Amino acid sequence: MSLRFVIGRAGSGKSTLCLHEVQEELKQRPRGKTILYLVPEQMTFQTQQALIGSEDVRGSIRAQVFSFSRLAWKVLQEVGGASRLHIDEAGVHMLLRKIVESRKDGLSVFQKAAEQNGFFEHLGSMIAEFKRYNVTPSNVYEMWQQLDTHSSSAEQKLLANKVYDLQLLYDDFERALIGKYLDSEDYLQLLIEKLSDSEYVKGAEIYIDGFHSFSPQELEIVRGLMRLGTRVTITLTIDEKTLAQPVNELDLFYETTLTYERIKQVAREEKIEVEKTIPLMKQPRFHSQALAHLEMHYEARPNEKFHGEASVTISTAANLRAEVEGVAREIRRLVATEDYRYRDIAVLLRNGESYYDVMRTLFTDYNIPHFIDEKRPMSHHPLVECIRSALEIISGNWRYDAVFRCVKTELLYPLDVRKEAMREEMDEFENYCLAYGVQGKRWTSEDPWMYRRYRSLDDASEMITDSEREMEEKINRLRDVVRTPVIRMQKRLKRAGTVMQMCEAVYLFLEELDVPKKLEALRIRAEESGDFLFATDHEQVWEEVMSLLDTFVEMLGEEKMSLSMFTDVMTTGLEALQFANIPPSLDQVLVANIDHSRLSDIKATFIIGVNEGVIPAAPMDEGMLSDEERNVLTAAGIELAPTTRQTLLEEQFVMYQMVTRASEKLYISCPLADEEGKTLLASSFIKKIKRMFPDVKESFITNDVNDLSRSEQLSYVATPEVTLSYVMQQLQTWKRYGFEGNLDFWWDVYNFYVTSDEWKQKSSRVLSSLFYRNRAQKLSTDVSRDLYGDTIKGSVSRMELFNRCAYAHFAQHGLSLRERDIFKLDAPDIGELFHAALKRIADKLLRENRTWADLSIKECEHLSALVIEEIAPLLQRQILLSSNRHFYLKQKLQQIIFRTSLILREHAKSSGFVPVDLEVPFGMGGTGSLPPMEFALPNGVKMEVVGRIDRVDKAEDESGTFLRIIDYKSSSKALDLTEVYYGLALQMLTYLDVVTSNAHTWMKKGSTASPAGVLYFHIHNPIVEMKGDASEEEIEKEILKKFKMKGLVLGDADVVRLMDNKLSTGSSDIISAGLKKDGSFSARSSIASEQEFNVLQKYVHHSFENIGKDITEGVIDIAPYKKGNKAACTFCNFKSVCQFDESLEDNQFRTLKDMKDSEAMEKIREEVGGE
């Protein structure tokens, strides 16, 4: 029994020496005693390849490559002890979740922390760390007692409470495992206990290679191997000079030196002979003088400079994507021109989560075979999401998001259905559920769902149509597709008495959905499309889910568990599932993490993402214990994993290992911006390399090839997939600035695409965008007629929409596009309720031959409550009755109607105008409807402007009859004559024109009426601020002022006094007008003469004629208006359709100039030729 060290700097040939010894021994004595070759888990595959890669050794039974965990399996299979069930990381997380849930009330610190993402991953890691460092639950308990006794500060008490929680959970976890289960760390402990019984290990020649340090648990295994083996050879990366000096924590080889001393100490304790150390001084790995210099002088202070051409390249990239593309281009160049194999190349990085998706896409586009040495989570696979969301449906009372997350996995679809058709139907079904607010008991009720096309309160009494009945049948059929399997599982889960029965319910749910067959179909489809990675995913995920259910049953099968806890535990397990990595092929680029990789036989290394805070890593507290807390525990005798300070000291060694992997070329790069465009800084490590290599090659990698030389541009011509985007860049440059001779080879590339049978069609779609202009072509006369008909019938709002943006009008009224309905109370719904409520009260007063002035305060309150109760069941699919929140909102709306009723009562008392009709239709047909505003357009098309007028008031005096329009608004509004001029506010003047023009037919026969004005009434329940102790009368007066109606009234003092009979001089509290002492109007009065009203009405006609002409001539310009801070696009539903973009030459706002009312009136007069 002896111990031998083989030491040397990186690249000195330590592993090569050991492998050659083993190979020579196998060649001389192929049937001798066992040879164990122990390496880190990440090195097992490549070491096995290297061991049998010699021409003289094609295979071996005598020599075996193991990691510690694989050796444990081997020994336990031989001597016994492996019969207990293995639980993987997912099983550990599930068990911990169950333990935490059952212990929750007794936890001090982790009670709330347990709900945070990643908690169980950290807790599992903490327990694994305890085991690796031989810390038992009793050790943790003793530590808690010690801390609890001596804690004085808040920080000490927090640590004591944290340690208390940890010992409780660790102890429960260990008790749950005893005699039944083994987790990954338990195998090493069992190996320590059983190793001495192994005949396989006794007398073996043992090599331990590729380690830099050992945990206490691993060190005990090394101790056991020393006792049993003939000779143990351990390789360590140490400079021989370091061993001759005192151990210094700042030394590059500090970690490996400590490991060397610890192992020698174990050998002394076990009285094992320590052979003479073999120091390796040469650098056989490096075929490049520059890389040999980098290795030899990496830690030198000051930096030793290397002059001459260096095989080191430093690149900065415009962004992360440009960096990866630069790497891909260089890899292709090495393979194409320098006789490299893909397996000779490695890409090292640290922040893989930022890079992996981009690398998979780009390396595939560049046809670079690659292997990413990183496990992917299964959490996004349809099967995992289906189980998780189905359980969430049941535990969360059938919430919309959970239901449709489950639907979108497509595993609920019948097996033989056409997926494309089913997706379309499910989209319609989802729209229905959103519009009707379907959730909770409505899913489980047997009552059929109803479908009605809802537009307004008036639709509530209409009969169901055939198309509605057909849609209703489809909706109920799809409802059963979604709910039936979930309800079956729900019933089984509720009947289940044990965890085993609950797991069985999940399994039957999957089986009844034919999930195995559906996954097989997905696998076949992935293989047919050449996506072999995802093809294996579908196989793995089913096996892993079944294994998870088996583990759940094995661990907790006979226990009783609530549905919510079962869901939490199952979800925790599902989130821990990972896809196993498929071993790399013999010729792939290896992409690996700097911290975990163990590489050999690499000629060229690309180190990417070398940004500040990433390489070297910024210190960061992670896990259950902070650095300070770990130091306290270490001082008390509990050894744990290194603190972030120790890790930071070790970072130099990690970086040394990183830059010494390659034998010929080293590439270092960093992006200057991330995927979101945020600025990133280059690492100080790059400055260090520049100091060592003053002549280093530096380059800037960009996505834009325009500024590059011809030779540099040629490197961007790679595969057809990626080159197409660069062809587009060049053509855009040519289009914008003209042809340049040094770019002529791009025309050859362009010709390849347009003549290639394979790429002609694919490229035409991309290249055609070069001439894309975001302009809407004018519709032909025929198309316009087909869309709008021979007679255009539209509301004033439609006409105003056309003037806001012609394309928005086309989208809404030509294409009939609309946003999908959502079950929520929007401003239009509230406005509709207000209108309906006030109309019902007014109708009741008309029937009783009363006015608003006749109402008492109590009657106003009673009537407001009554009409709200009548309307609530009819509004937006009974939304006001759907929840406590909406019931509260109903009460608030009733208060607003009550307040509005009081104000209308006060207005009526002060006014000579009385309502003569409400919700007056024109052009709508039926009894009581006034005729539409009709236009015969020059192209022969008829146009009718139709609508409904909120309220028409009438007053009479000796000079005649006057009519005014009142429009109820749920927000404050005034009449802006600038907006009238631009056709954005035509509604009120149209209404006034309709009622005055048709006065002879709907009032007394043959009577005429003059315009008195148009006014907006703001429906709200205002809050007023009063100074001092104000009386109730003063408060009511102030509230009345808040309801002052804005608009435009006739500039006749008598008519104004009819509107406010309390007005003598000063400003009116009711309308936006005021009188001076001499009887003239104040400057702030919104007034117009009768002649001006006539001009305005003519202008309205003029505007409609122009709008009608443009609509029928097919004008659909993408030309939204902008006026001050108002723009047509602000609340437009069609922005995603028109794709208006100000950066495009053709897309600019129509900027409208704001004007004073007098200026606007003058321009209006000019347009119609008025005087």
Curated annotation (Swiss-Prot):
The protein's required cofactors: Mg(2+); [4Fe-4S] cluster
Pfam family, one: UvrD_C
Enzyme Commission code(s) on record: 3.1.-.-
Residues bound to [4Fe-4S] cluster: 805, 1129, 1132, 1138
Keywords from the UniProt entry: 4Fe-4S, ATP-binding, DNA damage, DNA repair, DNA-binding, Exonuclease, Helicase, Hydrolase, Iron, Iron-sulfur, Metal-binding, Nuclease, Nucleotide-binding
Binding-site list for ATP: 8-15
Subunit comment: Heterodimer of AddA and AddB.
Family under the similarity heading: Belongs to the helicase family. AddB/RexB type 1 subfamily.
Entry protein name: ATP-dependent helicase/deoxyribonuclease subunit B
Origin species: Bacillus mycoides (strain KBAB4)
Taxonomic placement: Bacteria, Bacillati, Bacillota, Bacilli, Bacillales
